[in-house]
């Protein structure tokens, strides 16, 4: 029996052994309307990601996680942090290509927003042999990625939405008046670039897509991965608070927190998050919840040891191990990576530091690099006391849900 036939039969048997996706999962009701900040009890440790917003129900199976809890997390993250992602089904995206420039137009509700993107293709990329792509904002080490056979597409995020309270740019041309953060607006820009690549750039494989940015743009890249299931790999670099920095743990001594972030750049997120200022321990989620909402798709977290402001240590010893508990339980632990380096904030070396993992995900190129190492730090296990209470799951069945959900999720466009 050939290996391909063997894998086909094995996959079929695994799927037959599990409940059909067509069998509707009965989900606990999400409170409606969503509770206000004062309604939540303070919690010093990370919230249990397996517990629903009602505070009583708990996930028991992987099927339930994907069909019930993960969608609830996406809703509550929009309610309490990002603002509600626009209905993409009401948008019409068109694009024209002139050499290596994409001109993108998005129409919705009788309004139009426009911006552009730049295409950088590796040698040998063609319609017959399309390359994977990383879509980046704010700069990236193009040459390292191009040499590795990965296309790099960039766009000016300020043409989508400014980094200010101003309401200019393509996104606000369509959605002015909505309580939506700039991180979500920039994420929307990533997604519309991907639409344009699908339409006009056959040299790029639009099913193998990474998204990246650093600092506030790393927060935006995280939002891009969160809100579009076509994203294969999310690459938030030094993302800090409202990214993968934990709200409840500031371990650097001078770090970004909810208070100084909302004071300095309140437009990054919606107004509701501001109601948790000085009471972040009431938030019904933390950074690990955001990461878990992206599973089973891949994430690599870049952190510099000499980058205290974005709480690199907190991301490494609190967020990463807590999120990995969920990924491991889902049978996709290898999809979550941590890349600690010696440098500072947004060093270009960060992009080469994560490149072996990028190639493993986007090109199936094996790497010997250990992307689970927390060195020079160690996990703060007291931050997630629920770690010993993961829902039961037969180890032999762990990999099957990943196979079933990968196809369903990566073929689905933004919410």
Spans of features found by a protein language model:
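Fungal secretory targeting signals
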Residues: 1-24, 415
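Primarily recognizes the serine-hydrolase "nucleophile elbow" in alpha/beta-hydrolase
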Residues: 192-256, 264, 268, 279-280
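Structural recognition of the beta-strand scaffold that forms the well-ordered cores
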Residues: 133-136, 151-156, 210-212, 232-237, ...
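Flexible loop/turn segments at secondary-structure boundaries
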Residues: 143, 160-162, 218-220, 241-246, ...
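Extended catalytic-interface subdomain
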Residues: 211-214, 236, 270-275, 279-304, ...
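Cap/lid segment of the alpha/beta-hydrolase catalytic domain
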Residues: 135-206, 240-250
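Mobile cap/lid helix-loop segments that gate and shape the active-site cleft of serine hydrolases
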Residues: 238-290, 312-320, 326-332
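Alpha/beta-hydrolase-fold serine-hydrolase catalytic core, especially in secreted/extracellular enzymes
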Residues: 25-116, 121-129, 229, 295-299, ...
């Amino acid at each position: 029996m050939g290996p391909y036939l063997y894998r086909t039969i094995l996959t079929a048997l695994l799927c037959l052994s599990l409940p059909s996706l067509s069998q509707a999962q009965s989900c606990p009701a999400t409170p409606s309307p969503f509770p206000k900040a004062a309604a939540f009890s303070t919690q010093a440790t990370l919230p249990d990601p397996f517990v629903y917003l009602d505070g009583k129900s708990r996930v028991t199976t992987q099927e339930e996680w994907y069909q019930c809890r993960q969608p609830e997390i996406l809703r509550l993250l929009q309610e309490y942090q990002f603002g509600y992602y626009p209905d993409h089904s009401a948008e019409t995206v068109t694009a024209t290509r002139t050499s290596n420039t994409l001109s993108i137009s998005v129409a919705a509700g009788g309004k139009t927003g426009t911006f552009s993107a730049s295409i950088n293709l590796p040698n040998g990329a063609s319609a017959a042999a399309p390359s994977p792509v990383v879509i980046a904002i704010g700069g990236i080490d193009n040459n390292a990625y191009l040499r590795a056979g990965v296309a790099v597409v960039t766009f000016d995020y300020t043409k989508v939405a400014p980094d200010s309270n101003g309401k200019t740019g393509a996104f606000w041309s369509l959605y002015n008046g909505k309580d939506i953060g700039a991180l979500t607006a920039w994420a929307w820009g990533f997604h519309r670039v991907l639409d344009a690549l699908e339409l006009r750039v056959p040299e790029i494989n639009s099913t193998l897509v990474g998204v990246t940015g650093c600092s506030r743009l790393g927060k935006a890249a995280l939002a891009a991965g969160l809100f579009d299931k076509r994203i294969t790999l999310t690459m938030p670099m030094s993302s800090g608070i409202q990214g993968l920095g934990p709200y409840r743990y500031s371990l650097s001594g001078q770090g970004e927190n909810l208070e100084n972030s909302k004071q300095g750049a309140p437009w990054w997120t919606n107004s509701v998050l501001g109601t948790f200022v000085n009471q972040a321990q009431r938030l019904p989620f933390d950074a690990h919840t955001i990461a878990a909402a992206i599973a089973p798709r891949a994430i690599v977290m870049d952190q510099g040891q000499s980058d205290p402001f974005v709480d690199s240590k907190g991301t490494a010893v609190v967020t990463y191990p807590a999120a990995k508990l969920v990924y491991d339980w889902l049978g996709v632990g290898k999809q979550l990576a941590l890349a600690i380096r010696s440098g500072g904030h947004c060093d270009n070396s960060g992009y080469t530091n994560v490149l072996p993992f990028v190639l493993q995900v986007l090109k199936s190129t094996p790497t010997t690099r250990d992307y689970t190492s927390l060195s020079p730090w160690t996990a703060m296990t007291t931050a997630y006391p629920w770690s010993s209470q993961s829902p039961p799951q037969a180890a032999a069945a762990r990999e099957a849900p990943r196979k079933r959900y990968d196809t369903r999720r990566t073929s689905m466009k933004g919410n």
